[in-house]
Amino acid sequence: MDKFKIRGGQPLSGSVTISGAKNAALPILMASLLPSEKITLSNVPDLHDVDTTLELLDCLGISHSNLNNNSVCIDPTTLNHFKAPYDLVKTMRASILVLGPLLAKTGKAEVSLPGGCAIGARPVNLHIEGLRKMGAHIDVENGYIKASVEGRLQGAEILLDTVSVTGTENLMMAAVLAEGETVIENAAREPEVIDLANFLNSLGANVRDAGSDTIHITGVNKLHGGEYSVMPDRIETGTFLVAALATGGSVRCEKTDPASLDAVLKKLEEAGATIDKGDNWIAIQSHGRPKAVNIITAPHPAFPTDMQAQFCALNAIAEGTAGIRETIFENRFMHIPELRRMGANVESEGNTALCHGVDELTGAEVMCTDLRASASLVIAGLVATGETVVERIYHIDRGYEGIEKKLQGLGADIERVTA
């Protein structure tokens, strides 16, 4: 398996171009089976999870062709299967997002229960119960969700018990071809949900109020083709900004969206950074050792859970002591034992971690456990004295496009070693 070798101690400096958002690209790719004509997507990140999603569409009979510059053309008119097999779904929890659109388009769907990062239960009950309210008959047997509906799905009022991004997206995609009006209450408000709604509307859907906690969808008979550009990745942006501050550097992120990062930017300023921003760029300037900052993760527009591990690495070398409380996922502190191997003074119990900043980290062999934990270990390696070896980086390849090349462009001493 590939690994990273990092020799830390160099401040990051320069500009980096941000890729398309993984968490927007995946649902948009799944939604690409809904229209009756070809679509072309641009700013699609080159990631393992994107490749898996395209493989999944292939399994459904949907053909695609990769164009230049992170673009892909998808032809949903060749859809001729309705089963998402375990071999593909086991590697990626987002595979559950095929359930709603596949059921809406074909009237039946068989989707294996999902896999992906080992960071908690992430139950699919919300998806199933919502689709049942829309008239679907659903059984869960032999590890598969087996869904069917006679005729079209029916519009319904759906109250989500907990805020769920994928639950909101799955039901939104199902509702665009349903008969009548669907209302999703307690909906997720993440920017990626808005991007999915904008994509669907560009194809002729009628989705309103995405970005609020109540989304209204009026079903249409069919969707047409079109072209769409995936939004920039706010988590990749945040990761580079944290890396810049942790190393005492100065970095400008290009082709990003500052409006989607308010909570993160406020915490970076609280940690001592100077932030400048324009319509599609963010620049960060460090001023000595960062200050430790308290973090509480919560659904958007609060602090995103996908940035928690990176700030844990930042707090590990910051001045002072700060707490981190994780309210979204259980079991999301798996990076902490690895950071301790590098000399971090971080303790955790339940969903809370306490970070006591140390003067320096030292290089060590560490192991990735999930996508965002991987990013925290890379940041720690960039700061540490000596050499850090980061193992099992297939986790980071799931969500960061060419991260080592982008870091090299900012002056980092990092290399990918192929086993």
From Swiss-Prot:
Keywords: Cell cycle, Cell division, Cell shape, Cell wall biogenesis/degradation, Cytoplasm, Peptidoglycan synthesis, Pyruvate, Transferase. CDD domains: UdpNAET. Its main location: cytoplasm. The keyword Transferase applies. It catalyses: phosphoenolpyruvate + UDP-N-acetyl-alpha-D-glucosamine = UDP-N-acetyl-3-O-(1-carboxyvinyl)-alpha-D-glucosamine + phosphate. UDP-N-acetyl-alpha-D-glucosamine binds at residues 93, 306, 328. It comes from the Bacteria. Phosphoenolpyruvate binds at residues 22-23. NCBIfam families: murA, PRK09369.1. This is UDP-N-acetylglucosamine 1-carboxyvinyltransferase.
